[in-house]
Each structure stands twice: as structure tokens, then as C-alpha cells.
């Protein structure tokens, strides 16, 4: 059973943009029912076209020189002429136990209780880079214009607020990305996690990442 547009819009609720209020306070103004968003990247379907990267940059107005999302191509796997490449998504994992949140001295880095999305309040960020140093996935950066920490937010303040799926999900031509509510057993993402083997990167660190991956069938899975 797939997640209908009505269910998705209900889950999105009133995802409001952060505007001069502490992240922990803003979280209380969002959908009171609460959801826990996650994503699956199917490495067996990803062709490395980088359409997701282009869509992310355009929708979220990410300047050149930095990126919220990167697709990394592996070394060739297999023997000629049967050569394959594995494509690995590098982006925020939206951890339930996010080190970046724990080290932030101003509360600018926060996990939204209503959606499970880890985000940054630019009005509180002082650019100290503690969160960048603490993130074991190396997916945060200082925005060259705002001089504050930035990263993937699942398009929380753009597409999600408008009732759409994240830009990367909408742009993927092979449907390698699935997004939805992990706490809804009937959602498309929950059904997928029941049907396919998945792994999570650096799971042993105890961060409880919410970016799942269907492994590429050649070679070993990176942990």
C-alpha cells in the first residue's frame, strides 16, 4: 500500500519556515500529530545521473562550491565488459541521536520533534562550526552567503512546506529515492523497508540515522 497524497499532506501538516525563533520553540508550532520522516536510497536503481543534486541546488538555492547532496561514484566493479559502478548518496542522515544537535551552544541545530527532521535555525547560528566537527558523516558546511551552518533538510522549508516531496525524490528518473513517515506502517517507505534488505551508514556509532540504503549488489557494503 503506497502513501497517498492526502496522507502525505496530512503528515506535512503546517511545516513552517524558521523565522527568528529558536528551533526548539518552532518545533512546537508544527504538526501536533507528529511524524518521523526518513528516506531510502536504492543503490541498485541509482544510475548516478545527479538529477537529484541539480534539483536540490535549484529548489534550495544552494550556491556553487558547496552542496547539500552529493552522489559519489565508486571505482569500477566487476570485469570488463561487465563493469558496474556503485553510487553512494552523501547527505544528512537526520539522526534520531544527532551529535550536531548535542554540541550546538546556541540551540541553532535542532531536531524537530514534529517531523524528526534535523535542521538549523540561521537566526541562532553563530558559525562556530562545532556541528560540522561533530557530524560523523561530514555533510554540513558553512553557507558562503549567510555564514551559517547548512545541510540537507529534506526540503523542509521549500517543498515540504508546499505539500510536495523533497526535490531530489521528485527529480529521480529511476525512482531510486523513497521518502515518507517511518512511523506509519502503511507508508510506502515502511513497506519498502519490510520488502527489501537495507543498511544504514555508520550505524555502530549509535546515531540512529534515518537514511536507509538498499545495497548495490556488487562488492561490499561500506559501514
Where are these regions (language model features)?
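N-terminal secretory signal peptides and thylakoid transit peptides that target proteins
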Residues: 1-16
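Iron-sulfur cluster-binding cysteine motifs and their immediate structural context
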Residues: 24-29, 51-73, 97-124, 130-147, ...
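Cys/His-clustered metal-coordination modules, chiefly Zn-binding fingers
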Residues: 153
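Short, solvent-exposed loop/turn segments at the edges of secondary structure
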Residues: 34, 87, 145-150, 206
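C-terminal segment of N-terminal export signals and the immediately downstream linker at the start
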Residues: 20-55, 204-214, 218-223
Amino acid at each position: 500500500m503506497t502513501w497517498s497524497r492526502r496522507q502525505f499532506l496530512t503528515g506535512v501538516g503546517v511545516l513552517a519556515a524558521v523565522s527568528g525563533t529558536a528551533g526548539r520553540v518552532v518545533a512546537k508550532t508544527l504538526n501536533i500529530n507528529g511524524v518521523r520522516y526518513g528516506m531510502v536510497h536504492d543503490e541498485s536503481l541509482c544510475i548516478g545521473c545527479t538529477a537529484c543534486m541539480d534539483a536540490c541546488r535549484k529548489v534550495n538555492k544552494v550556491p556553487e562550491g558547496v552542496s547539500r547532496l552529493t552522489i559519489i561514484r565508486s571505482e569500477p566493479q566487476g570485469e570488463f565488459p561487465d563493469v558496474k559502478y556503485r553510487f553512494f548518496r552523501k547527505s544528512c542522515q537526520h539522526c534520531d541521536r544527532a551529535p550536531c544537535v548535542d554540541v550546538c551552544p546556541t540551540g541553532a541545530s535542532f531536531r524537530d520533534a514534529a517531523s524528526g527532521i534535523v535542521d538549523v535555525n540561521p537566526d541562532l547560528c553563530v558559525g562556530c562550526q562545532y556541528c560540522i566537527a561533530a557530524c560523523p558523516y561530514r555533510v554540513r558546511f558553512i553557507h558562503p552567503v549567510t555564514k551559517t551552518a547548512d545541510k540537507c533538510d529534506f526540503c523542509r522549508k521549500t517543498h515540504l512546506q508546499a505539500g510536495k516531496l523533497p526535490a531530489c525524490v521528485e527529480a529521480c528518473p529511476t525512482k531510486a529515492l523513497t521518502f515518507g513517515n517511518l512511523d506509519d506502517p502503511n507508508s510506502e517507505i515502511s513497506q519498502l523497508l519490510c520488502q527489501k534488505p537495507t543498511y544504514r551508514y555508520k550505524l555502530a556509532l549509535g546515531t540512529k540515522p534515518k537514511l536507509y540504503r538498499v545495497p548495490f549488489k556488487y562488492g561490499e557494503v561500506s559501514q
